[in-house]
Amino acid sequence: IKSIMSDFPSFYSMVYYQYSKAVNIFLSDVIKDFLPNANQDMSYELGIFLDNIEYGEGYALKQLKKRIPVRHVIKFCDIMESRLKGYDNISQMTYLKNELDDMRVHTLEEELDKRKQKNERTQLVLIIILTTYIIVYYYFQVISAMKLFSL
């Protein structure tokens, strides 16, 4: 589910922009456009969704809700089901898009913090190695100078 949720904001963003431009969009077409960009788990779930869509979009959305019981996916399915009933819910779609964008930003910030910590550890190790090298180098320089002047 974690890998699906990492890809879901991109998928929803694509759905949002398609539906905000035109009303007569088939969800299956949007999914087919997204599949080449999806990760393995997301493509698997969307593939099942496309198989279920043969029985109707409403059925496919209900099955998706059952397979991925995550708040954002459930909200997405509810929004799409209400669109099928003829309601214009761009404001709800926009709200969910903003929520998913915030989630994506939060995820990216966490990733950035992890990378910073890893970078700081690597820098510390490199500084220790360099300091050790400098100490050993100057130690041998001093020993060499002492031998030179003791003759």
Language-model regions, residue ranges each:
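Juxtamembrane/interface alpha-helical elements of multi-pass membrane proteins
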Residues: 1-51
